[in-house]
């Protein structure tokens, strides 16, 4: 299993060392950090990207980093599965959380993400155009209704 985590490149990229600014991008909710499940072959990555985009008021391009479950578990980080808050209802259960109860876990996760970002294969950029095409296809294929996304343009 792979996970996708949205991130702000201006806080991470071009840095040789991890710093507090990068870690500030790892906002928590009840000591959890949000991630989305992606198939190992990344066959559902477009739908997952759309689910992430539909957590916001409008569709915007974004960067995400691919995380591997075996690496997460090697760091002894625990998962806390909770439905995602997205208008893409069919994918709400593809959401998960990484538990980070202390600064140690946040630090481990930040180091791992930073390492993953150093390999371009692990960094994904989803353009607004791509996301809108994904949305069009999802509506066309009855994966999501127009009523569910009426506020999303």
Language-model-detected regions and their locations in the chain:
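ADP-ribose/NAD+-binding catalytic cleft of ART/PARP-like enzymes
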Residues: 1-33, 47
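Conserved NAD+-utilizing ADP-ribose enzyme module
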Residues: 25-31, 39-153
């Amino acid at each position: 299993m792979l996970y996708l985590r949205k991130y702000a490149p201006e806080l991470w990229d071009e840095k040789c060392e991890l710093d507090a600014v990068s870690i500030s991008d790892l906002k928590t909710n009840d000591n959890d950090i949000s991630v989305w499940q992606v198939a190992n072959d990344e066959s559902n990555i477009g739908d997952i990207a759309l689910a992430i985009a539909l957590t916001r008021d409008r569709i915007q391009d974004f960067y995400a980093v691919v995380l591997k479950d075996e690496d997460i578990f090697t760091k002894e980080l625990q998962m806390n599965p909770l439905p995602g808050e997205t208008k893409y209802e069919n994918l709400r259960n593809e959401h998960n959380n990484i538990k980070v109860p202390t600064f140690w876990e946040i630090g481990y996760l930040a180091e791992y993400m930073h390492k993953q970002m150093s390999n371009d294969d692990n960094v994904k950029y989803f353009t607004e155009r791509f996301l809108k095409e994904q949305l069009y296809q999802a509506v066309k294929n009855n994966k999501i209704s127009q009523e569910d996304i009426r506020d999303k343009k």
